[in-house]
Amino acid sequence: MKRFRLFVYLLALVAALPVHAGKELTQSDRSRISGILTRIVAREVPGAGTRITGVRIKGRRMELTANIGLSYYPFRPESVEAIYDSVREALPEELRRYKLTLLTDGKPIEELVPLPFRTRIDRRRVRTFTNEAARPLVRRLDAPFTPDQGLADRHIALWQSHGRYFDQRENRWRWQRTRQWMTCEDLYTQSYVLPYLVPMLENAGAVVLLPRERDVQTVEVVADNDPGIDPSGAYREEEGLLPWRDAGTGFAHLRGTYRSGENPFAEGTVRAVRTVGEGAAESRAVWSAELPAAGDYAVYVSYKTLDDSADDARYTVRHLGGESRFAVNQTMGGGTWVYLGTFPLAEGANDAVVTLTNRSDRAGRTVTADAVKIGGGYGNVARTVCDSLRTPEGVYAEETSGYPRFCEGARYWLQWAGFAPKVYTPQQDANDYKDDYMSRAHWVNALAGGSERLPDSAGLRVPVDLALAFHSDSGTRQGDETIGTLGIFYTCLLYTSPSPRDTR
């Protein structure tokens, strides 16, 4: 009887084994499937070679893993079904009835179909992002319309391609991308992002943060509580029920140019006052500016985040169109430039162009006041060749780009905006080209550090919902093949890889 039971058990075990036991897809099978996928992807994304990098068979299930190139395809429900049919037809006969999953970028291709194109059932299965921040970084208090769904109060980190940079090996400033049709990608992509994409996102309720200067205005005036080199800006305080006081380190504009490692947000002081409720006499900080010409000017404010900071610091911008009022959440974003908007300003004296009051929904908290930046200006970060690349016969000097700041890459804006060297120069000043594209991911980490997005990391506490790079990938290849528009996204919480396009 025992022998009979053992025989039955072994018979059942053998019957459960797959018919392909001991077999894998041959290299010929992999190559054939890779070729099919490459041809499919090439219809939409030229140059994105696709290959099978892994095969896993368990029971009657098969997982095929493709490289990152497959993820660039714009998947739709019907195309996903067609791709599975094409791959299944290329499998050996004995494997075609297996449950097949095709993976790329760590996900099944069906999960890469955008939500609007999915069925109602598929949408319910998706876990979407939720913003747990009580209030966003900036709110427009007198906006004619305030969205309450969709992108409302979302924080989007967005950058408009490349920018002018200092080439260490050639000892000169240059564009990063190829010159084509009287422009280059460093400039061209901004013509989509700055006048169209950013306002569209902002009008939909999002707070958009950029690692490059967004203002094409070449005039820049800095008004600050600390004396500096800019005589066109002025600061004054008006005391109500509660007095202003010093609140530690802040911004000061003491230099015409900045070397790597020099931080204007660590060279001055910041002012603070406790908040009061309705009915109490308010204290105010007032910034004024003398402008050489009328025009549109971006207005940035700065402050220091404290443990008891107010989440509704109330700013008013006076301009030719009247007044615009904002509430800035000072519990996040301290120690950098925070964009309020772009406004038409008059030539000459603009008194009280920005005003901050200590009136708040809750008394007893703190608002802080530091510098205000008006306009984009010219680049003020000076660069030179690093010691390891210098030659005895070379002539070296520190020099700025000589271009408006909006033309420059992120590496230089991030220094002017108060970020640490580990953010803007991960290559430790040896390679500005790599610093520029790598710094953008580190900037997102620095923004989100300390928020619910990255609670275990130090940073500015801004809960970034999305980071998006907008590129045209302008250029040519051999055979006169052109390269087209490309969006780069990163799906991990924290960027740690040295590879700029590792989208694990």
Region annotations inferred by a language model:
Residues 152-241, 382-481:
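Catalytic-core regions of hydrolytic enzymes
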Residues 22-59:
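N-proximal, solvent-exposed amphipathic alpha-helical segments enriched in charged/polar residues
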Residues 355-364:
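Short beta-strand-plus-loop segments that form exposed binding edges in beta-rich domains
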Residues 495-504:
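Single conserved hydrophobic/aromatic residue that forms the stacking wall/gate
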Residues 320-348:
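Extracellular carbohydrate recognition and processing domains
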Residues 283-307:
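A short beta-strand element within beta-rich, extracytoplasmic domains
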Residues 307-322:
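Short, surface-exposed beta-strand/strand-loop-strand elements in extracellular ectodomains
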Residues 73-162, 167, 375-396:
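Non-catalytic propeptide/linker segments at domain boundaries
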